[in-house]
Amino acid sequence: MVTVCERYEDDALMAEKYKIMKINVIGYIVNVYGCCFFFVFEGIRKRFSGSHFVTVVTYYPKYEDDSMPATTVRILATLILYMMMLTMIYSADTFTMVYLIMYKYKFITLKKYFENLREEFFALIDRGEHDMATEKLADGLVEGIKMHHALIGLSSDIYKAFGTVMALQVCQSSGSAVSLLLQIALSDQLTFIATVKLMSFVLALFFLLGLFLCNAGEITYQAAGVADAIFYCGWQSCPPRPKSDSRRNIRQLVVLAIMQAQRPLVMKAFKMLELTYGTFILVVRSTYSVFALFYAQHK
């Protein structure tokens, strides 16, 4: 992943990539731990109102046990859970997001490469160095095709590494959101803090799902723009074959490169569920539809 297009990465583009990564990761961590804060706050409120501090269900203590050791165990279990969540966030969720963003910016770098190749080609044409411009364009096309082929090959590696994580996130977000929304709708005894706690959990689930699906959809969008970048590289303004290598047909190279770039690159989960912007909207709508169906039957 790191070595593909590394020679042609622009400092400004890499700074933008790092900024996007930081926004995604920090936004997700704030969302998740904001949700956790409401869970703890609700537990503390119950404790001071004469009920139990329960945020995690454990074997010990029993629900009726309200002694100091039992309360201590509940607090320790909550702290351990939050530390485990931090490791899961960094080792699974944010790692997946970072790789998707890196992959997206590789395609942006490739498009910039073809745009720079076009500028260099026409700069040589303006100076009257037609042969050198043709040779540089031919060599640049070959280099770009190799990088594009390597990038397409990386999609299968990303699926093998992170496909299960993204697929489970789609299922978890939809199923958990329906359950939590029904709990809010069908319960008449929820306090305001408890309602905020559950709603923040639902928002955290959909926020992570949106980060996965929207970043994956952005890969499809950026990959689709490579074909246009190749087509406008300037091949129309040069002879079909460079003099130094008459076996190399520039127009044939362009046709093959565009054919390769026009194949839709769509990230998938379970090898069938497309990870795109449309899928995110579909999951949100389906979740609400299932919730509305169960709620209507209950009423």
What are the roles of these predicted feature ranges?
Residues 1-2, 229:
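Cytoplasm-facing ends of alpha-helical transmembrane segments in multi-pass membrane proteins
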Residues 2-100, 105, 112-130, 179-207, ...:
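Helix-loop-helix junctions within predominantly alpha-helical proteins
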Residues 26-32, 120-123, 127-299:
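Terminal membrane-anchoring module of integral membrane proteins
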Residues 98-99, 106-113, 218-225, 229:
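Membrane-spanning helices that line or support transport/gating and their immediate boundary helices
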